[in-house]
Amino acid sequence: MAKYADITGWGKCMPPAVMTNDDMASVIDTSDEWIVSRSGISERRVSHVPGSDLAAVAGHRALACAGLQPEEVDLLIVATCTPDTVIPSTAAHVQ
């Protein structure tokens, strides 16, 4: 096993559903201006599938970008603030 790490490919998978600040304002008492002025956020993605499913798609895209097969990967790291479950980790679901 190598003693260093390389980023040899990357992939992403974003849910198609978008919730704008105006959409948010129709549900709670807020406005686009209020949200943007305090957070800089104008829209967010909304997923109806587990994050591990999105991560798996992104992982396959990263492998294709790098020209690698899954068995050639020594380590999988997943970072998220919205895990599918506390235990096991999202990385375990993706693996």
Model-assigned labels for residue ranges:
Residues 77-95:
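Active-site-proximal gating segment of KS-fold condensing enzymes and close homologs
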Residues 1-77, 95:
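Conserved "HGTGT" condensation-loop signature of ketosynthase/thiolase-family condensing enzymes
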